[in-house]
């Protein structure tokens, strides 16, 4: 005879198993709660007049007419149970997601396509987009809920042009150097014309078999190298006394013969094991550090205007203006020291290096979201949580229903306003009025 305690245990196991099976990567609109750490990149189909100068360095990979998102976690109502009532409040995303950018849609009715994947399920990994092959790679990140760290392999996704694609591993030239790299999470990553760059990061027990805390310097992955594709540049960098960086964004701006990689925000840690990922010294947005990706020479520029306050886990995108300006848009983020999550959009306009802030009422603070530019002048945001409103308690912030339906937001970069729908045929981008006014004033 089975005792009551054993019977209860068996029933509980069966219930948990059914909940696990019911978990999906794209919940219904009403069951969806939150999504975090989904990463990707946007690349226009071609450098036409409508898309030239668009750069997205902290979000999903737009290749052709689709934006791809990979990795992260999702929370949802399952069998009537809220996330905080389940055995864990979120679950890793098991598929690669994509959205069609040729169709009009609202966040509530947008179709999010799923593609099965053999690649590891990681959080905060880097995505490097190779424009020459219309494909992307993933590197680094951490596993959630104590899952086994995967072997050191370079995973590659080749889209099929219809929102799907194929995953596989590649053996980079100089593979010994690649496998010897410390695998970290939360670094700033960016793609240039021929390389992917990864700055800083934090090696913990979920990212590397031999975790050693904050990682200084930066990595370069040359897509076309015939000898050693991966190089570790551990020399000093100017943005931090320790050379470390976590929770920042890196942005590639098309200035000069080689372009420039710019670092925005984030925090820096003392080197060594035992450091907390939250114990950081914040980088200021009033000073911008940028590097020539070919010569590796660093430059520094002071900004003017209304600079953002210190923060981590924001996102950035950039668009070429019609009058030889280039605007970089920074959205969201959080400051653990001040216990604040932000719903703010700031604009840094080049060559003036002036900050402006979009004037709208904050309604949906979030960090760890992705953002891309699509439809010429629209920023699409994906995911994010209000971490500080819930004291960084994941059970609470995963339980909170997102005011962005399916976690998707649409922001007009010219009008500086949130929109109810995405329009692929929106008017061409023009610099916001507050940016044009600054230049007109001389």
Residue ranges and their predicted role:
Residues 4-21:
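Cleavable N-terminal signal peptides of Sec/SRP-targeted secreted and luminal proteins
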Residues 23-49, 58-115, 140-168, 222-225:
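Beta-propeller domains
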Residues 40-48, 105-116, 157-179, 219-241, ...:
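Blade-edge beta-strand/turn elements of extracellular beta-propeller
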Residues 49-70, 74-76, 115-137, 154, ...:
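Conserved short beta-strand element of beta-propeller blades
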Residues 73-91, 139-151, 201-213, 263-282, ...:
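Short, conserved, GDST-rich strand-edge loop motifs in beta-rich repeat architectures
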Residues 79-80, 148, 166, 208, ...:
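Intrinsically disordered, low-complexity regions enriched in proline, serine, glycine
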Residues 84-104, 149-163, 209-227, 276-296, ...:
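Beta-propeller blade signature
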Residues 91-94, 131, 222, 232, ...:
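N-linked glycosylation sites
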């Amino acid at each position: 005879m089975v005792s009551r305690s054993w019977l209860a245990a068996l029933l509980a196991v069966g219930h948990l198993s059914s909940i696990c099976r019911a978990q999906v990567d794209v919940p219904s609109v009403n069951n969806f709660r939150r999504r975090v750490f989904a990463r990707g990149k946007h690349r226009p189909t071609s450098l036409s007049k409508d898309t030239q100068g668009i750069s997205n360095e902290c979000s999903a990979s737009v290749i052709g007419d689709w934006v791809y998102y990979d990795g992260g976690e999702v929370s949802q109502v399952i069998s009537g149970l809220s996330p905080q009532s389940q055995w864990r409040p979120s679950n890793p995303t098991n598929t690669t997601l994509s959205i069609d950018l040729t169709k009009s849609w609202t966040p509530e009715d947008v179709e999010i396509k799923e593609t099965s994947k053999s690649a590891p399920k990681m959080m905060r990994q880097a995505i490097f987009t190779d424009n020459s092959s219309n494909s992307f790679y993933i590197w680094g990140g951490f596993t959630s809920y104590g899952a086994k760290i995967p072997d050191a392999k370079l995973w590659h996704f080749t889209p099929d042009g219809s929102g799907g694609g194929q995953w596989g591993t590649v053996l980079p030239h100089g593979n010994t150097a690649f496998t010897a790299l410390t695998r970290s999470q939360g670094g700033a990553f960016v793609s240039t014309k021929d390389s992917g760059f990864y700055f800083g990061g934090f090696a913990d027990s979920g990212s590397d078999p031999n975790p050693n805390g904050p990682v200084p310097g930066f990595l370069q992955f040359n897509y076309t190298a015939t000898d050693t594709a991966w190089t570790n540049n551990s020399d000093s960098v100017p943005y931090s006394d320790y050379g470390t960086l976590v929770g920042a964004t890196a942005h590639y701006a098309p200035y000069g013969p080689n372009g420039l990689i710019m670092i925005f925000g984030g925090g820096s840690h003392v080197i060594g094991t035992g450091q907390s990922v939250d114990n950081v010294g914040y980088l200021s947005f009033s000073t911008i550090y940028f590097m020539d990706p070919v010569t590796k020479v660093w430059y520094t520029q002071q900004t003017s205007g209304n600079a953002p306050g210190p923060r981590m886990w924001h996102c950035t995108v950039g668009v070429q203006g019609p009058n030889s300006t280039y605007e970089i848009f920074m959205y969201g983020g959080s400051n653990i020291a001040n216990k604040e999550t932000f719903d703010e959009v700031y604009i840094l306009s080049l060559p003036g290096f002036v900050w402006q802030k979009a004037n709208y009422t904050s309604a949906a603070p979030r960090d760890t979201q992705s953002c891309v530019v699509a439809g010429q002048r629209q920023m699409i945001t994906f995911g994010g949580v209000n971490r500080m409103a819930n004291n960084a308690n994941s059970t609470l912030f995963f339980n909170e229903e997102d005011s962005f339906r399916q976690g998707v937001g649409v922001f007009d970069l010219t009008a500086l306003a949130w929109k109810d729908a995405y329009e692929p045929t929106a008017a061409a981008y023009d610099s916001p009025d507050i940016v044009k006014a600054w230049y007109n004033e001389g």
